[in-house]
């Protein structure tokens, strides 16, 4: 690909860098959420560009559920060491003490306690007044109507009917004590934009995004990769090796793989050009009930 043919990516890059710099200048204690996925990798790359040759003026925060893929943990630690940024890792201690897990307690309770409550705990503990997230509007309908600067009250709740206008790239970050802003620099990017940018900028990603023979089982119409011995096999389920990759990454028991032969970035991009389904079709948490993502966001989720 010739970078000069992708001027829209340069425009998206410039917009995102402007937003990141704006937040760093406007807020007293910002943080960048780091979920280890492709969007986080792009957002981190943009942040490093925004402040090059200096260091990032804010830490990265990973809210750990204890159920991420092993390759994700390895990639997280490798990336933090390679780039030398401050990495904060928070795991909900109450959830750990209760032994919360997706097999016993289900996806909704696991997500609420380990991700949603864990996130709010970390934001309160460190007193962050702004938090960057890698969500994009093309991912899901509730995210499609959310502003780039997403106002949250002192309980971290989002009210879609109480959003601020964003005219001519002017963002309103005025908040009272205890309130905060969630910031989405990648709002206007698409999944295809993300992959093209990763290719053009040679951004390192978790290998799980590339197709490979992996141990999977079929459950509720999804291909679940068996990542460790905590798997709870149901009667009739069989683990088999299949060529699969992931379009989105989360907790391994709650994230479905897709059958694919795309082992390189150009092959992934080719897949994206003909895809007619959302990348979040592989997320069990989005299937909990109708409008489940918006409900989670109203309660404090990203």
Curated annotation (Swiss-Prot):
GO molecular function list: ATP binding; sulfate adenylyltransferase (ATP) activity
UniProt KW Signal keyword: no
Listed GO biological process terms: hydrogen sulfide biosynthetic process; sulfate assimilation
Pfam families reported in the protein's UniProt record: PAPS_reduct
EC category: transferase
The keyword RNA-binding belongs to this UniProt entry's keyword annotation: no
Disulfide bond annotation, renumbered to this chain: none
This protein's UniProt keywords: ATP-binding, Nucleotide-binding, Nucleotidyltransferase, Transferase
Pathway as given in its UniProt record: Sulfur metabolism; hydrogen sulfide biosynthesis; sulfite from sulfate: step 1/3
Entry superkingdom: Bacteria
InterPro entries (alphabetical): PAPS_reduct_dom, Rossmann-like_a/b/a_fold, SO4_adenylTrfase_ssu, Sulfate_adenylyltrnsfr_sub2
Catalytic activity, EC: 2.7.7.4
Catalytic activity: sulfate + ATP + H(+) = adenosine 5'-phosphosulfate + diphosphate
Function, in words: With CysN forms the ATP sulfurylase (ATPS) that catalyzes the adenylation of sulfate producing adenosine 5'-phosphosulfate (APS) and diphosphate, the first enzymatic step in sulfur assimilation pathway. APS synthesis involves the formation of a high-energy phosphoric-sulfuric acid anhydride bond driven by GTP hydrolysis by CysN coupled to ATP hydrolysis by CysD.
Subunit structure: Heterodimer composed of CysD, the smaller subunit, and CysN.
HAMAP family on file: Sulf_adenylyltr_sub2 (MF_00064)
Family (UniProt): Belongs to the PAPS reductase family. CysD subfamily.
Protein name as it appears in the record: Sulfate adenylyltransferase subunit 2
Gene: cysD
């Amino acid at each position: 690909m010739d970078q000069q043919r992708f001027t829209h990516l340069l425009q998206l890059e410039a917009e995102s860098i402007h937003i990141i710099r704006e937040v760093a200048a406007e807020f007293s204690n910002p943080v960048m959420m780091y979920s280890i996925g492709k969007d986080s990798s792009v957002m981190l790359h943009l942040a490093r560009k925004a402040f090059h040759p200096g260091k990032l003026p804010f830490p990265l925060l990973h809210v750990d559920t204890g159920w991420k893929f092993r390759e994700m943990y390895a990639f997280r630690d490798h990336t933090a060491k390679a780039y030398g940024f401050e990495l904060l890792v928070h795991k909900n201690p109450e959830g750990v003490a209760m032994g919360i897990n997706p097999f016993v307690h289900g996806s909704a309770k696991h997500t609420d306690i380990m991700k949603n409550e864990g996130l709010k705990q970390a934001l309160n503990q460190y007193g962050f007044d702004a938090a960057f997230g890698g969500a994009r509007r093309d991912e899901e309908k509730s995210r499609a109507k959310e502003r780039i600067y997403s106002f949250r009250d002192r309980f971290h709740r989002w009210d879609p009917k109480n959003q601020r206008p964003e005219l001519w790239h002017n963002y309103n970050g005025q908040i009272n004590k205890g309130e905060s802003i969630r910031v989405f620099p990648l709002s206007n990017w698409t999944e295809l934009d993300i992959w093209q940018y990763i290719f053009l900028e040679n951004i390192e990603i978790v290998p799980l995004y590339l197709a490979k023979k992996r141990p999977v089982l079929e459950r509720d119409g999804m291909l679940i990769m068996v990542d460790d011995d905590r798997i709870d096999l149901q009667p009739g389920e069989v683990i088999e090796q299949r060529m699969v990759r992931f379009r989105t990454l989360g907790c391994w028991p709650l994230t479905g793989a897709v059958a694919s032969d795309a082992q390189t970035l150009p092959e992934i991009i080719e897949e994206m050009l003909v895809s007619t389904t959302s990348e979040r079709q592989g997320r069990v948490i989005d299937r909990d009930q109708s409008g489940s993502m918006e409900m989670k966001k109203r309660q404090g989720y990203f």
